[in-house]
Amino acid sequence: MQSYHTVIGIFALGNSVLNLTVRDDDIGWTVDAIKRNMALKTEETFCEQIISGTDGKRVKTKISRAIETEAEHFTRATEYANKMYPLLLKNIEEAISEIYLKDLGYHRNTKYPKQEKINELIAMAEEYAEKSINNKNNEKAPNWEEEAQSNLFKRKRAAELAKLLETKCIFNEIKGSTNLERLNQLLATETGRKAIHTALIANRKRKIGSNMMDIIVCGSIPPYNELLGGKLISILSCSPTVISDYTHRYENQVSEIASRMKGQRVIRDSKLVYLGTTSLYAVGSSQYNRIKVPLSENSNLEFRKIGITEGFGTVFFSKETTSLFSKLLELQDGGKKINHVFGEGT
């Protein structure tokens, strides 16, 4: 930075929240999003109607009407299913390929996994969950294969593989002759919807830690706040320079958890493709609202509100109370289960 260089405002890129329903729904990473894309498109309007026998009392009524023909709906849904169904299958196979399997007794190319094997993996995960105490990180020069075989990651690998194989079995049982029929069959049952959810999450896990970030803007410093400096900082956070710097900063970054799950070094794709943000208040954001920058004849860079998040309250415990809870859990579990080790929290 230059000496006496003007500082208009401060911003940073932070890790995206893992579970954010309104964002995932907007991207298409939820079962509800798939159901909407498969459904007939409708338009809802509201009007007031007089209720008979009430001396002119009016009630607000919702009217729904189709905005596409049955033929248009069939064509659109078919195209969507032909794209989505193979993608769901691909997500499952790619997730399985990222798990170290040598000590799990599973062959990677098994097309039709058996329920007996899934039950074995579930039992293995439960067994190693009991052994996952006093975990330690080898942060200096980790041997990824040895790390994968640790009690903590053997438990994680067995549990993840069991879930993925169970999902694969559900997809194998679908008998439809077209992708449209197969996807509709999955959406029709709770088991099928659960399988879709697992396949979507498998994709989200790979994207959320590397291709997506949250914008954190602290606002502008006087006198630039009077010149809407905060909005300028928000716009510049999406600039080619920021995206390029992010890509180069993380292009050789080793994914700690993914490497331990696979038993070898994993470097995720670092191309930044999604920037989002959340706000403390739901009423609006003076920092981001009304931002719109023309890019070309048919496109704009603009802030788009996609929904309202749901949050939970927080509680505060004193250091003394926290220490006593920690000692109590150690006595109960026979050791420390939370040791600030990669993988314990996810």
Positions of the model-derived regions?
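Extended, composition-driven regions rather than compact fold-specific motifs
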Residues: 1-346
